[in-house]
Amino acid sequence: MVKNFSISVISKKENKENRGSIEFQILNFTKKIRRLTSHLKLHKKDFLSQKGLRKILGKRHRLLAYLSKKLKICYKDLIEKLEIRDTKTH
């Protein structure tokens, strides 16, 4: 629950006007991923949700790769704020 609270604070504070930015999209994907993982802990055989989770993970991965190539400083800050692992493929 603490992670969800910190994400909501970040989204309200920084991205109120700029909803199309890469950071805001990654933030929304992270919210969806955390919500789906908690759902899948209860419903292990929900294969459609698993497929949706994999799609969202792929989209977030591509956006993070783009952000790491274009804006390395913003990428590092976002990784720290959202507490996401830094992948080595970027």
Swiss-Prot record:
Establish whether keyword Phosphoprotein is in the entry. Answer: no
Among the GO molecular function terms of this UniProt record, one is: structural constituent of ribosome
Q: Which domain of life is it from?
A: Eukaryota
Q: Where in the cell is it found?
A: Plastid
Name the GO cellular-component terms.
plastid; ribonucleoprotein complex; ribosome
Transmembrane ranges, per UniProt, are none
User: Where does this protein chiefly localize?
Assistant: plastid
Q: Which Gene3D superfamilies match?
A: S15/NS1, RNA-binding (1.10.287.10)
Record-linked SMART domains:
Ribosomal_S15
How does this protein assemble? Part of the 30S ribosomal subunit.
As for family, the record states:
Belongs to the universal ribosomal protein uS15 family.
HAMAP family annotated for this entry?
Ribosomal_uS15_B
Q: What is this protein called?
A: Small ribosomal subunit protein uS15c
What's the source species for this entry?
A: Cuscuta reflexa
Q: What is the lineage of its organism?
A: Eukaryota, Viridiplantae, Streptophyta, Embryophyta, Tracheophyta
